[in-house]
């Protein structure tokens, strides 16, 4: 797994700057563009997926124990809960980073120039989260080699995507989408493998999470525009308003029931 991560990073370092130069950028411009992706956008992606990495790590022994006892109902329950939690965290993070990419760039880095790289890296939060959690499920079921094989296939897809998409038309956005394709292919292959082992997920719940996140994104944009959109205060206020609207929408759409709300540290005090 560590080897795969190093290979993925090596593809970016070895190919992306060269592809940007081939597309017509100067060495200085290509270096700056790559810096926006690797030095500004990708750290945000990794930071946003820390909770899902922890979730995936805790999932392995839990699923492994149920698998050893041949308790498939418990495995399915844990897998469905983990997938739901993953989407609850990563889908709004992806939407928020997409719609507020430029303001986030200004807030954190003092420049709007990383906005494009941040925006087009946003889907990778959700896709990497899915990859992490599904990998944890498969490893817990004893299929340790399968996630690594799927990761290698994802890296191969990324290699092709970097060569095809990092060009004059797409620029650094193409390199960001190559990473999205990498995580997306790996996550999809993991999900297909889980389906072959009769693990099912509640896609209706996931669709509701996406709907809530979409409304949240609209709230973020509207609040940011109403407050002028140029200040750090406007960005922070937009994030807060978006977060509040998302939390309100989840129970209204039936994504979280009263019992699940009690388990959330932030709101459980209101559901005693």
Functional labels for PLM-detected ranges:
Residues 3-5:
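Short, small-residue-biased leader/transition segments that mark boundaries at the very start
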Residues 30-52, 84-85:
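Alpha-helical transmembrane segments of polytopic membrane transporters and translocases
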Residues 38, 71-88, 92-100, 115-118:
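Interfacial transmembrane-helix starts/ends
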Residues 46-69:
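Helix-loop junctions and terminal segments of transmembrane helices
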Residues 123-153:
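Membrane-interface junctions at transmembrane-helix termini in multi-pass inner-membrane proteins
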Residues 145, 155-192, 218, 222-240:
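Membrane-interface helix-loop junctions in multi-pass transport and translocation proteins
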Residues 221-272:
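Membrane-proximal transmembrane or re-entrant/amphipathic helices at the cytosolic face
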């Amino acid at each position: 797994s560590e080897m795969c991560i190093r290979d993925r990073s090596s593809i970016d370092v070895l190919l992306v700057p060269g592809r940007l130069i081939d597309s017509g950028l100067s060495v200085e411009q290509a270096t700056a563009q790559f810096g926006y992706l690797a030095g500004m956008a990708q750290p945000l992606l990794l930071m946003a997926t820390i909770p899902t990495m922890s979730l995936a790590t805790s999932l392995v022994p839990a699923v492994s124990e149920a698998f050893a006892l041949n308790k498939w109902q418990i495995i399915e329950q844990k897998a469905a809960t983990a997938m739901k939690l993953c989407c609850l965290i990563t889908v709004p993070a992806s939407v928020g980073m997409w719609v507020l990419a430029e303001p986030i760039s200004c807030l954190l880095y003092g420049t709007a120039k990383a906005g494009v790289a941040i925006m087009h890296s946003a889907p990778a939060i959700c896709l990497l989260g899915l990859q992490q959690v599904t990998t944890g499920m498969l490893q817990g079921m004893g299929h340790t080699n399968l996630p690594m094989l799927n990761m290698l296939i994802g890296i191969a897809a990324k290699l092709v995507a970097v060569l095809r998409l990092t060009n004059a038309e797409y620029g650094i956005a193409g390199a960001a989408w190559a990473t999205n394709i990498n995580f997306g292919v790996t996550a999809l292959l993991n999900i297909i493998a889980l389906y072959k082992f009769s693990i099912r997920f509640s896609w209706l719940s996931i669709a509701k999470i996406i709907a809530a996140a979409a409304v949240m994104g609209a709230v973020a944009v509207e609040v940011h525009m109403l407050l002028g959109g140029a200040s750090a205060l406007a960005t922070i206020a937009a994030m807060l308003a978006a977060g509040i609207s998302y939390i309100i929408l989840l129970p209204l759409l039936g994504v979280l029931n009263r019992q699940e709300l009690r388990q959330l540290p932030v709101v459980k005090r209101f559901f005693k």
